[in-house]
């Protein structure tokens, strides 16, 4: 493991999903992350950054590309694709809680932002989602992203789950 990286992985759970948030894998850390995905029955990884590693090294895991600019908020089409990935993963897992891996470069901006969106869709209030994620992953989510989340409206009726 790279000792300079302080946020290796964080697990956050909602009623329908378990999220594994992590830094971008490197040649040295891919074996660790492959093992982590296997131990958590994770067959979906969402990558929010540019391609910097060989995705084929994660055999048996589907890599979804949801890239958007670091420090920014996701465009509407990225949010829609994120929610569709979560819905599909839930269905493929027989409507049982399913595990989704998600990463950007440091795992502190884009990654926790998308997880907050999922938590809001799952019925959590926006600032509750931010506080919950930050309680698990220190320094996550910047001020413009928090402003975006405060104004974010779940696509479903209040209290409905991602499904």
UniProtKB/Swiss-Prot annotation:
Residues 161-163 form a propeptide. Its EC number is 3.1.3.48. Residues 10-161 form the Tyrosine-protein phosphatase domain. A lipid is attached at residue 160 (S-farnesyl cysteine). The active site is at residues 70, 104. It is an enzyme of class 3 (hydrolase). Keywords: Disulfide bond, Hydrolase, Lipoprotein, Membrane, Methylation, Prenylation, Protein phosphatase. Transmembrane segments: none annotated. GO terms for molecular function: protein tyrosine phosphatase activity. Disulfide bonds join 49-104. Substrate binds at residue 110. Phosphate binds at residues 105-110. Signal peptide: none annotated. Pfam families: DSPc. It catalyses: O-phospho-L-tyrosyl-[protein] + H2O = L-tyrosyl-[protein] + phosphate. GO terms for cellular component: cytoplasm; membrane; nucleus. The modification Cysteine methyl ester is found at residue 160. It is a lipid-anchor. It is found in: Membrane. Its main location: membrane. Belongs to the protein-tyrosine phosphatase family. This is Probable protein tyrosine phosphatase type IVA B. It comes from Dictyostelium discoideum. The lineage of its organism: Eukaryota, Amoebozoa, Evosea, Eumycetozoa, Dictyostelia.
């Amino acid at each position: 493991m790279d000792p300079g990286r302080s946020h290796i992985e964080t697990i956050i759970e909602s009623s329908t999903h378990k999220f594994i948030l992590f830094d971008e894998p490197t040649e040295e850390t891919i074996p660790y992350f492959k093992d982590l995905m296997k131990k958590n029955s994770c067959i979906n990884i969402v990558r929010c950054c540019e391609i910097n590693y060989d995705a084929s090294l994660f055999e048996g895991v589907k890599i979804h590309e949801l890239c958007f600019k670091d420090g920014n908020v996701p465009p509407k089409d990225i949010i829609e694709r994120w929610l569709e990935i979560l819905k599909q993963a839930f269905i493929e897992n027989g409507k049982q809680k399913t595990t989704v891996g998600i990463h950007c470069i440091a795992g502190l901006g884009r990654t926790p932002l998308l997880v907050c969106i999922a938590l809001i869709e799952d019925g959590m209030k926006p600032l509750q989602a931010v506080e919950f994620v930050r309680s698990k992953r220190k320094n996550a989510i910047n001020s413009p992203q928090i402003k975006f989340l405060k104004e974010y409206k779940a696509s479903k009726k209040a209290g409905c789950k991602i499904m």
